[in-house]
């Protein structure tokens, strides 16, 4: 949620900042702005709405080689031009952009700023006014910046300009992602490396409660007490072409099509020369020593976790619980004696999951992160990490990250089973290869799936997805995809629960998408379809080859029964995509949603 960029170098800062913000659009935002410094002062341009709107108001006549930029997701104050970042101090000396939530900003206003008239409703403006107050009291800018950050409770990633010293950007971080990119004669600031790949692929990780003093030729990292910190940059495992649509009309469609290649990439990364699964011995040992596994996740990652539970319990005979991250700490379950926590997050920055991880580490328990972003907060703070190797996922609605998470969970479950001496009776690597081929087949059936979306969903108000056993978990994900991008009220239900209330919502023409990929519940789910059809529903049955019947709407290529979620979700992704397209929705950037949820 939100995004920050900063640039100090020799090129036109305006265009670099705007391009950087465009690369952060996937994170979700409702307004955007930039500030660039010149000898005459700091020039601010900001607007409610898209970055394209911001571009229209930027004065191209202003020449600058230093600046900061921001995309805002409203948390304090409505989406508006006034509340958009950047914000300035009362005298306009200091200019700030900020991601995160300052939990004690009201108290800080009462304690320090009663004589200041604030111009916005944001928590951010309090921060920049505090810096100015402490400078007026005689502190240096650096000392005032550190003093201010030491007072803040909550999360923040901050970049600050001083119009009396336009050769410096002051940066601070706590519980919100922020990187500093380095290059000869040029340095940059970004919430995400993707934003500044146009400038450099060398980045410094900034830890919580650190500040960075960034000039054109130097980067100095310090703790809040002023202690200098030494750190080497790392090379971002990204290519600029990874974050372009190429010939695709939308990132979501591109990322759906990339799924077969992602699965093959995962196989390559986690396969020994003899064809067996290769995981770090430390991870294997941690899983083996655990008497219960607790999977913590949110949204799509939570749905992957539900499938992961089935895989681990069925393969490795190890008990697993799956919890929604935002709810876990409110009523923590009675933990087993030797728990292992697995955190699943595409970005590795999910605030709710990080909150649980912090508490878990305080209790002394081991944690494993499954993420698509190496070097992310969850990756750094957990004991172990499994990387999903899916490549950048730009569309807000997750597709390839979901199937990648399930593939990695498959390998984790299979490796644990092997370590326990359990014979699965099949080769997981080989079966995942079959899955990749099946995915490719499905991605080539877009016309059929577009027709289903047009016939069933283009004009509907609501839709229900039903399934049993593992299919139910995929139905939850299919419903989420549809509601995320098409704004259709969609819900996933266990087939057996229909008669316990949901069937009351069925009326003439209600679309029902039913999954039938599991032999042991095939007759039961078909019975549910007959129940709703008898009450006027418009059923769409998606079945597995070998279980299909003549009137089924769509038939999936056959894969191993435990791995059906990796293929059955693809038609649901494509149906959601085409439904959104036919309804005129913004597929890649749906309203009110953010890709990376970095505030609680």
From Swiss-Prot:
GO molecular function, one term: carbohydrate derivative binding
Keyword Transferase belongs to the record: yes
Segments forming domain SIS: 283-422, 452-590
EC number: 2.6.1.16
PROSITE patterns: GATASE_TYPE_2, SIS
Positions of the catalytic residues: 2, 595
Pfam families the record matches: GATase_6 (PF13522), SIS (PF01380)
Keyword terms of this UniProt record: Aminotransferase, Cytoplasm, Glutamine amidotransferase, Repeat, Transferase
Entry GO terms, CC: cytosol
Domain of life: Bacteria
Recorded catalytic activity of this chain's protein: D-fructose 6-phosphate + L-glutamine = D-glucosamine 6-phosphate + L-glutamate
Subcellular location: Cytoplasm
Top EC class, one word: transferase
Annotated ranges, domain Glutamine amidotransferase type-2: 2-217
Keyword Acyltransferase among record annotations: no
CDD domains per record: GFAT (cd00714), SIS_GlmS_GlmD_1 (cd05008), SIS_GlmS_GlmD_2 (cd05009)
GO terms under biological process: carbohydrate metabolic process; fructose 6-phosphate metabolic process; protein N-linked glycosylation; UDP-N-acetylglucosamine metabolic process
Coarse class of the protein's main subcellular location: cytoplasm
Function: Catalyzes the first step in hexosamine metabolism, converting fructose-6P into glucosamine-6P using glutamine as a nitrogen source.
PANTHER family in the cross-refs: GLUCOSAMINE--FRUCTOSE-6-PHOSPHATE AMINOTRANSFERASE, ISOMERIZING, GLUTAMINE--FRUCTOSE-6-PHOSPHATE TRANSAMINASE (ISOMERIZING)
Protein name: Glutamine--fructose-6-phosphate aminotransferase [isomerizing]
């Amino acid at each position: 949620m939100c995004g920050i960029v900063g640039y100090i170098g020799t090129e036109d800062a305006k265009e670099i900042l705007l391009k950087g913000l465009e690369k952060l659009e996937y994170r979700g935002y409702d307004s955007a702005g930039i500030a660039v410094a010149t000898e005459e002062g700091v020039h601010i341009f900001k607007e409610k709405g898209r970055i394209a709107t911001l571009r229209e108001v930027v004065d191209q006549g202003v020449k600058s080689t230093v600046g900061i930029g921001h995309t805002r997701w409203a948390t304090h104050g409505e989406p508006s031009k006034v509340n958009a970042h950047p914000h300035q101090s009362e005298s306009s000396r200091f200019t700030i952009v900020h991601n995160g939530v300052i939990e004690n900003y009201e108290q800080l206003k009462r304690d320090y700023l009663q004589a200041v008239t604030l111009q916005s409703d944001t928590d951010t403006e309090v921060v920049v006014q505090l810096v100015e107050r402490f400078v007026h009291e005689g502190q240096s800018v650096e000392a005032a910046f550190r003093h201010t950050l030491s007072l803040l409770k909550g999360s923040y990633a901050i970049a600050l300009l001083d119009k009396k010293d336009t050769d410096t950007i002051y940066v601070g971080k706590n519980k919100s992602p922020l990187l500093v990119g380095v290059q000869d004669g040029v340095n940059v600031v970004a919430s995400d490396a993707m934003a500044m790949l146009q400038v450099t692929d060398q980045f410094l990780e900034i830890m919580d409660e650190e500040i960075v003093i960034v000039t054109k030729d130097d980067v100095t990292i310090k703790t809040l007490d002023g202690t200098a910190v030494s750190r080497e940059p790392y090379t971002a495992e990204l290519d600029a072409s990874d974050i372009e649509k190429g010939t695709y009309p939308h990132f979501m469609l591109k990322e759906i099509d990339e799924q077969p290649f992602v699965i093959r990439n995962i196989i390559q990364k986690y396969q020994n020369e003899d064809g067996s699964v290769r995981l770090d011995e430390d991870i294997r040992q941690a899983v083996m020593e655990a008497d219960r596994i607790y999977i913590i996740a949110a949204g799509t990652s939570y749905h992957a976790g539900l499938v992961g539970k089935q895989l681990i319990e069925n393969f490795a005979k190890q008990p697993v619980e799956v919890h929604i991250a935002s709810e876990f700490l409110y009523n923590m379950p009675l933990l087993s004696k030797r728990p292992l926590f697995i955190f699943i997050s595409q970005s590795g920055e999910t605030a709710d999951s990080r909150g649980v991880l912090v508490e878990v580490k305080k209790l002394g328990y081991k944690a494993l992160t499954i993420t698509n972003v190496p070097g992310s907060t969850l990756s750094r703070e957990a004991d172990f990490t499994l990387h999903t190797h899916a490549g950048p996922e730009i569309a807000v609605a997750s597709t390839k990250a979901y199937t990648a998470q399930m593939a990695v969970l498959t390998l984790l479950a299979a490796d644990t089973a092997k370590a326990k001496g359990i014979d699965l009776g099949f080769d997981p690597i080989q079966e995942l290869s079959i899955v990749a081929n099946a995915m490719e087949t499905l991605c080539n059936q877009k016309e059929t799936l577009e027709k289903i979306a047009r016939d069933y969903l283009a004009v509907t108000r609501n839709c229900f997805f039903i399934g049993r056993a593992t299919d139910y978990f995929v139905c939850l994900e299919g419903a989420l995809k549809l509601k995320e991008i098409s704004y259709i009220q969609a819900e996933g239900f266990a087939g057996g629960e229909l008669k316990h209330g949901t069937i009351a919502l069925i009326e003439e023409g209600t679309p029902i998408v039913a999954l039938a990929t599991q032999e042991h519940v095939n007759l039961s789910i078909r019975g549910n379809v007959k129940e709703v059809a008898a009450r006027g529903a418009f059923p769409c049955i998606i079945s597995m080859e070998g279980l299909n019947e003549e009137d089924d709407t769509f038939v999936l290529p056959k894969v191993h029964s435990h791995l059906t979620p990796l293929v059955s979700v693809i038609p649901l992704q494509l149906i959601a995509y085409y439904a959104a397209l036919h309804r005129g929705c913004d597929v890649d950037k749906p309203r009110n949603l953010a890709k990376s949820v970095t505030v609680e």
